[in-house]
């Protein structure tokens, strides 16, 4: 399964042939090798074994904390994914999906009871690459990029959040729903920091949905990353086409209002989100998502990247459409977005400030809370990168039914602490101090 399946041709080697001559009475008269055995190739993965182990444990533990009420309120959290990616190379340092499974149980035949248990919990389903989810407010950086690059706004443009948005179906910012007044005048950096829905509703009104879709695609959303694992999904980025296909009705302004805060038909995998955040962190540079550091033959010769790609693409049926080009955007655009993401974690009013205010390092992040359409359940996202000034890693965490993105942030914090070798200060009681979180924040 997994990477072993993809790289089977490189790993298995070739059997040798030994010929044995025998006399009529069964006596061996000669023995020699007619074909030498060829050892399999050596595959070095990008995965950091210690970080992988820690990431799996941190994800599992925090899901259980949410489900048990350790953070103050019980949620139906029962599944999720977490990814750590090198923002400069696209190398995967850790990739976890929960619930997971024990591969060794399949070697001698898994019991029907255990298999039924796995099927019920979708343990064999890799949520990091196969799960597609509405991104919630983590999508706002796409909308911000589109607005700045199309000239819809500048970095100095201010929009007054009065609470209830006056157009369309009159949606309210989460802040108004919670506190009964708006954020007031905000610029784009502040709108990202405070995750102001009203601000982004207005951007949707001013520029429409087409530029948003265009820049979502430029960030690689809705498009497979080409990671060397089977089962990767595309997601949904062609929002207007999909709307027409499933409803038979053309796209409406109300759909735009929902889409710009990461709802509507937006649907992306955690691995796509990790690539997207990495591109924000590295200044928009193209990266190739990969699990393979190197493959060498039995004599120590390194196999070319091109040859490996051809083999993997053929095995998994991948074409070159997974390649995302470097973003052709103004330097100021991504710099402004990064500042907004820094404010999320380091400035009062930032939606993850209560979690990261004591982190000891400047980082950037964005929370996201996305309605699932099922019994008022909300998935939680945290996407971010660190360090802020010279980014090394992007961390993406998705927890199903977490209640909010704020509830997902502690998982990302602990993963970052594990990567940087910090003495992880478990965030438990402190999380109860976070204001209750509304949808799409």
What is each stretch, according to the model?
Residues 1-40, 57, 274, 346:
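Small/polar-residue-rich segments within soluble enzyme cores
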Residues 428-441:
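Short, highly charged C-terminal tails/helix-capping segments
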Residues 61-69, 98, 343, 421:
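Conserved helix-loop functional segments at active or binding sites
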Residues 23-34, 47, 80, 87-137, ...:
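Beta-lactam-recognizing serine transpeptidase/beta-lactamase-like catalytic domain environment
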Residues 52, 66, 132, 401-404:
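Short strand->helix junction
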């Amino acid at each position: 399964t997994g990477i072993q399946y993809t790289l089977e041709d490189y790993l298995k080697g070739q059997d040798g042939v030994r010929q044995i001559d025998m006399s009529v009475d069964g006596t061996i008269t000669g023995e020699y090798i007619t074909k030498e055995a060829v050892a399999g190739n050596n595959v070095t993965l990008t995965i950091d074994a210690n970080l992988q182990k820690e990431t799996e444990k941190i994800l599992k533990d925090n899901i259980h904390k949410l489900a048990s009420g350790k953070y103050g309120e019980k949620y139906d959290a029962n599944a999720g994914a977490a990814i750590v990616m090198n923002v400069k190379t696209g190398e995967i340092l850790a990739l976890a999906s929960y619930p997971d499974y024990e591969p060794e149980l399949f070697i001698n035949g898994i019991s029907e009871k255990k298999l039924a248990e796995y099927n019920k919990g979708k343990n064999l389903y890799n949520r990091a690459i196969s799960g597609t989810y509405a991104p919630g407010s983590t999508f706002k950086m796409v909308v911000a990029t589109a607005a700045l690059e199309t000239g819809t706004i500048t970095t100095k443009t201010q929009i007054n959040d009065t609470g209830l948005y006056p157009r369309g179906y009159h949606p309210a910012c989460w802040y108004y729903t919670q506190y009964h007044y708006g954020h007031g005048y905000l610029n784009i950096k502040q709108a990202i920091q405070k995750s102001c829905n009203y601000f982004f509703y207005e951007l949707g009104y001013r520029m429409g949905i087409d530029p948003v879709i265009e820049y979502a695609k430029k960030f690689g959303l809705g498009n497979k990353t080409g990671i060397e694992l089977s089962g990767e999904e595309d997601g949904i980025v062609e929002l207007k086409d999909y709307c027409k296909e499933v409803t038979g009705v053309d796209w409406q302004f109300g759909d735009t209002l929902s889409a710009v805060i990461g709802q509507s038909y937006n649907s992306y995998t955690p691995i796509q989100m990790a690539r997207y955040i990495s591109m924000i962190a590295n200044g928009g540079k193209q990266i190739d998502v990969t699990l393979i550091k190197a493959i060498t033959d039995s004599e120590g010769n390194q196999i070319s990247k091109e040859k490996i790609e051809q083999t993997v693409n053929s095995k998994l049926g991948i074409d070159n459409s997974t390649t995302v080009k470097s973003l052709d955007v103004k330097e100021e655009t991504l710099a402004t977005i990064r500042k907004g993401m820094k404010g999320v974690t380091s400035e009062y009013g930032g939606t993850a400030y209560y979690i990261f205010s004591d982190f000891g390092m400047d980082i950037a992040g964005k929370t996201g809370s996305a309605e699932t359409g099922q019994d008022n359940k909300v998935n939680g996202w945290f996407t971010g990168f660190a360090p802020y000034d010279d980014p090394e890693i992007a961390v993406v965490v998705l927890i199903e039914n977490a209640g909010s993105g704020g509830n997902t942030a502690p998982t990302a914090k602990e993963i970052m602490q594990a990567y940087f070798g910090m003495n992880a200060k478990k965030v438990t009681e402190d999380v109860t101090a976070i204001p209750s979180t509304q949808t799409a924040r």
